[in-house]
Every structure is written in structure tokens, then in C-alpha cells.
Amino acid sequence: MKPLTRPATLSAQVYQAVADEIVSGRLKAGMHLRQEEVADRLGVSRQPVQQAMVMLSLDGLVIKSEKRGLYVAPFDPELMQKHYDIRSALDGLAARQAAQRLSFDTFLVSRIEKLGEGILAKGRAAISQSNIVAQITCDEAFHHLIYDVADNPLLATSARIHWQYLRRAMGEVLRHVESPQNIWQQHEAILSAVVKGNSATAEKLALDHTSSASKRLFEAYKDIGLPNEKVVGKR
């Protein structure tokens, strides 16, 4: 890890640094998180680390135990499915409302299309570089673009907690699937439907996209066995 700067936002930076390590798999389920070591690696005091650990605990990425202290939360596919179910509903609604808006606000169409294509290009570049964290960041950016176009601020707010948790699920999937390009083909199809103002198609594609993501997660879990509660209990 690189030393962090900008003291006013240190706790948020520590949060993101640790979350990225969990998402990337560098910090695995059950691994202890000693605040002194995290602070030393990041070049910060313990206070922002403590604050970050509270946020990580609230988002389900870290668990605090009286006996074990702080450790990376186990991978829970059933809980992941619940998060995917809610995100699916939000993403379907967002795609439909975004397409409806662009169907009568043609001034925005070319701008949104350009922004979307830029994110698609970055996502595909991240695949070619085998950069999982960057792939997830671009994936999240794409969906937040759709939230923004839908012009419903409650969508992004409601989706935030699910995205924080599902970033980890996405990391697990991307480490174990052979064709992440399919994800970006689906994004491209959603974008196309949105900019064409085809609300029914956009909604269906968004729902199918989240459903396939959930399916990939469970296939990876079944095929190779991702870390779970039992694994953690044996450590």
C-alpha cells in the first residue's frame, strides 16, 4: 500500500484501501486486521483506521469479535443473493426511467452516449490489463451513469449499501470466470436501449444482467468453493 495524504478524508481513504484489498482478494476471508499494522502500511495514525473499520463493519466487509478482534468477513453467498435481488429491482427501474427520460430529452442523448461509451472503453481496457479493481470501478461507474440519467436521486442512495457489499461478490466472480467480456457486452446493450429511449427493453436487459451476475456468482461458488463461514471457523 502507498502512504495516504489529505488528512481531512483519511478515514474514507483507509476505508477504500482496505475495501479494495478485500475485493481484489489480497485480504481473504478470516484474515485478522490489526489496526496498528494497517496504520503503519498506510502511513496514518490509528484514529482514521478505527473510523474506517467501523464503516467496513457496517457495510458487512469486516467483523469485530471479542475473541478474535477484527477480521475479514466470511463470504456469504445467500446474503449476496439478497443484495443482488434488491439491486436488480433498482437497476431495472433505473434503466426504464433513464430510457423514458431520453425518449423526450433528445438534447442529452449524444452526451450520455459519449459518456457511456467512454466507460465501456475503460472497462474493456481494465479486462485487458487483468485489473479486477478497475473493472469493478468501471462497472459501478456505468450503473451510476444510468442512475444519474434516470434523474431519481433515491436510486443511487438506495443502491449504495448493496454496491459496497457486492463489490466483493464481483471480485470473486471476476477472479474465477473466463469471459468477463460478456459483462461489458451486456452493458453495451443496456446503454443502446437507454439512448434509443426503449424503456421496456432497457429494463429487461438490466434485470437479465443482474440475474446473470448472480448466476455467475453461484456457479463460481459451486465449482471452486469460495470462502464461507465454515472456512473461517477452522482458522
Could you say what each language-model-derived stretch is?
Residues 78, 83, 105-171, 185-189, ...:
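Conserved amphipathic alpha-helical segments that form helical-bundle/coiled-coil interaction surfaces
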Residues 18, 94, 98, 146-150, ...:
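Hydrophobic recognition helices of helix-based DNA-binding modules
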